[in-house]
Amino acid sequence: MPVRWYNYVSMKVSLNLIKQLINFELPPVDELVSRVNQQLGGVEEVIDLKAKYGGARIVRVVECEKHPNADRLSVTKIDDGGVADVPRDDNGYVQVVCGAPNVHADMWAIWLPPKSTVPASFDDAEPFVLDARPLRGILSQGMLAAADELAIGADHEGIIEINEHDIPAGVTLQTGASFAEVFGLDDYVLEIENKMFTHRPD
């Protein structure tokens, strides 16, 4: 008789993905969790990705100059489409100091404005909430984010540069757009204990 091994004890389920596969409306998350607990297995965690990435915005870097007091820093001006409540210059642009070697004018990037939480720290006991602060004498309104800071990769060598081919089909790059909405991260993920699989008699 063959022996079957079930190495996984839980699975993660995206509600956005489920919505693409069904032709009816899902109940509110709390109600859905209750039903899953009753019929499938225990929901171990509900991950609110929209809250995790809620502050992240897609922006265009319109100016980039060397920091006058630091060789490895740049002073940028970004266009966020006017969505954030932050100080601006006469052209409506926001000043952000950046230490990434790949930052340059005319690039599209991901901005975490003041009062937003760095996604990589979202689940920490004390999440890192950004504020406007001076870096070597120049005020920076938040930060331009690298992959590891967004918890979507390990790269910290440079900030994420968004190109046209990175954008989902049918979506146009717009300044100030929600990073979560553009890339399908306005989602809940349920981590479910796989009782229905791991407790099978075979």
Question: For each of these PLM feature ranges, what is it?
Answer:
Residues 6-202:
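Phosphate-backbone binding interfaces of nucleic-acid-interacting proteins
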